[in-house]
């Protein structure tokens, strides 16, 4: 991902204020509610029968935290996202058979959740920088697909 120094500073500054537990669960939960076909990858998560069930599901929250912890690693390695996410790309491609389009959807949902949490602090410039990052992460996660 090619970010200016200003964009990198904006992304890392805001990310330092993110509650990974809360935002991760909310982002994954919203993905599963807004794009219900993504639920098929989470059969083992139990009750996903309604928006309230999804948003309150402890397995959704735990996996959302895991996802955002991986995203945090990506932010530390913006110049090598493909390398950072190589193993996760392989896992999601070869073993889990996740549609790589879902990575883009989750990235966009994450941007919406960040905007909701940070309000005026999430300026158009910050959003533009985050859109670049989530697109780069989605591309890195889709890298092993053929």
Swiss-Prot record:
As recorded in UniProt, coiled-coil segments are none
Which GO MF terms are attached to this record? haptoglobin binding; heme binding; hemoglobin alpha binding; metal ion binding; organic acid binding; oxygen binding; oxygen carrier activity; peroxidase activity
Record: residues binding heme b: 63, 92
Q: Which residues carry this modification: N-acetylvaline?
A: 1
Q: Does the keyword Heme apply?
A: yes
Q: Which residues carry this modification: S-nitrosocysteine?
A: 93
Tissue specificity as recorded in UniProt: Red blood cells.
Give the Phosphothreonine positions (modified residues): 12
What keywords are annotated for this sequence in UniProt?
Acetylation, Heme, Iron, Metal-binding, Oxygen transport, Phosphoprotein, S-nitrosylation, Transport
Q: Which residues carry this modification: N6-acetyllysine?
A: 59, 82, 144
Modified residues annotated as Phosphoserine in this record:
44
> What's the name of the protein?
Hemoglobin subunit beta
Q: Which organism is it from?
A: Lutra lutra (European river otter)
């Amino acid at each position: 991902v090619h970010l200016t120094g200003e964009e990198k500073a904006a992304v890392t500054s805001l990310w330092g204020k993110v509650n990974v537990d809360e935002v991760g669960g909310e982002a994954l939960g919203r993905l599963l509610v807004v794009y219900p076909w993504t639920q098929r990858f989470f059969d083992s998560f139990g009750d996903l029968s309604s928006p309230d069930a999804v948003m309150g599901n402890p397995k959704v929250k735990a996996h959302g935290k895991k996802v955002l912890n991986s995203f945090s690693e990506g932010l530390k390695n913006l110049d090598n996202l493909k390398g950072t996410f190589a193993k996760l790309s392989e896992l999601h491609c070869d073993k889990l058979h996740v549609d790589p389009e879902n990575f883009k959807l989750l990235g966009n949902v994450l941007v919406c959740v960040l905007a909701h949490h940070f309000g005026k602090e999430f300026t158009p410039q910050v959003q533009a920088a985050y859109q670049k990052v989530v697109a780069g992460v989605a591309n890195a996660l889709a890298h092993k697909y053929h």
